[in-house]
């Protein structure tokens, strides 16, 4: 009896790209619902619009590259990018801001380099940084959790029809801590509605929700613990090093930084990107540490309140070098070959 001899791989896993993307989308649901609960339906409007723009850009670029649109549109990667942008952008972002960020993420962050699996930078963070650098005023329109708008007002904000579009602008705790150095941190927490129990008001709950979703992905083994732990450890260590207990010039406590801004979103949904990050476990740990350290440096001394996106893009640049110096031991050799050799 002749036995079939199919080509390798003979052992097949269940983690195909569409299945992975569905898990990531599902893990973002707690954070998405928390954002909607605290800040109103603006985030859902961002998500719906970003998804339409992402799919349109994906289809157009696939057509230009003469690739079958049906196959690649179903993998869910464009929707994941749209979701990450939707939860990162302010809930009251105008429609054109979401369009610009999503367009740059899909076209310049993904397809310019060859599509899924070829991008050296995280597409969502690239689109976010383009929006932040180009339109800083619109990127600061975060409302207070106790003054969230309903659907009609959120829709007017989204369409740019509001009579006073800046009326609901609200400084986050990271903004206040960077600009108000006359008060101690304890005084800021006691007298400013931007601060919650651990970090920014509202942001601490959003971070807890994304932490829950990230732990679910970790439990499902979609990624290893190295990059998230490295990032959180780097951020924690830097904030602990410069924390003096009360002075506002210490830039906030370790817990404050862990539960403010986009910390947990970055730790579990951004730095774990298998394409733009490091590949070995040791490299992922170094990559995460670098993101955490750079995030704190930008938060404390940079020109932006939250430096997560910039930190990720800078470490994306360093990822090939990290991979080169953290190569695992090759089977049959006693130790890994590291560093550049003569003639390389």
UniProtKB/Swiss-Prot annotation:
Top EC class of this enzyme: translocase
Requisite cofactors: FMN
Keywords attached to this entry: Cell inner membrane, Cell membrane, Electron transport, Flavoprotein, FMN, Membrane, Phosphoprotein, Translocase, Transmembrane, Transmembrane helix, Transport
GO biological process terms held by the UniProt record: electron transport chain; transmembrane transport
Chief site of localization: membrane
Coiled coil stretches, renumbered: none
Entry-annotated residues carrying FMN phosphoryl threonine: 172
Biological role stated in the UniProt entry: Part of a membrane-bound complex that couples electron transfer with translocation of ions across the membrane.
Name used for this protein in its record: Ion-translocating oxidoreductase complex subunit D
Taxonomic source organism: Pseudomonas aeruginosa (strain LESB58)
């Amino acid at each position: 009896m002749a036995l079939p001899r199919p080509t390798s791989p003979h052992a097949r896993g269940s983690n195909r790209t569409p299945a992975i993307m569905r898990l990531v989308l599902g893990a973002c649901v707690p954070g998405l619902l928390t954002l909607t609960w605290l800040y109103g339906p603006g985030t859902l409007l961002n998500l719906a619009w970003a998804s339409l723009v992402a799919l349109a850009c994906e289809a157009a670029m696939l057509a230009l590259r003469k690739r079958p649109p049906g196959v690649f549109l179903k993998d869910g990667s464009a929707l994941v990018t749209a979701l990450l942008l939707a939860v990162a952008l302010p809930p009251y972002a105008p429609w054109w801001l979401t369009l610009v960020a999503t367009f740059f993420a899909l076209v310049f962050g993904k397809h310019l380099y060859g599509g899924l699996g070829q991008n050296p930078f995280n597409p969502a963070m690239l689109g976010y940084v383009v929006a932040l650098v180009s339109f800083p005023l619109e990127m600061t329109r975060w409302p207070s959790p106790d003054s969230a708008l309903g659907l009609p007002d959120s829709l007017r904000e989204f369409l740019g029809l509001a009579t006073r579009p800046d009326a609901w602008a609200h400084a986050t705790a990271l903004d206040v801590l960077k600009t108000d150095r006359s008060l101690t941190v304890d005084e800021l927490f006691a007298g400013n509605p931007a601060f919650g129990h651990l970090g920014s008001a509202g942001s601490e709950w959003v971070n807890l929700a994304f932490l829950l979703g990230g732990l679910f992905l970790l439990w499902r083994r979609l990624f290893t613990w190295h990059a998230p732990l490295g990032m959180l450890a780097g951020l924690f260590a830097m904030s602990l090093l410069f924390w003096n207990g009360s002075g506002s010039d210490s830039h906030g406590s370790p817990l404050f930084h862990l539960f403010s801004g986009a910390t947990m979103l970055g730790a579990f949904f951004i730095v774990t990107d298998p394409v733009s990050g490091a590949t070995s476990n040791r490299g992922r740990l170094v990559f995460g540490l670098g993101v955490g350290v750079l995030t704190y440096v930008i938060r404390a001394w940079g020109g932006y309140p939250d430096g997560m996106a910039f930190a990720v893009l800078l470490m994306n640049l360093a990822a090939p070098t990290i991979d080169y110096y953290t190569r695992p031991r090759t089977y049959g050799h006693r130790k890994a070959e590291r560093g550049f050799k003569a003639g390389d």
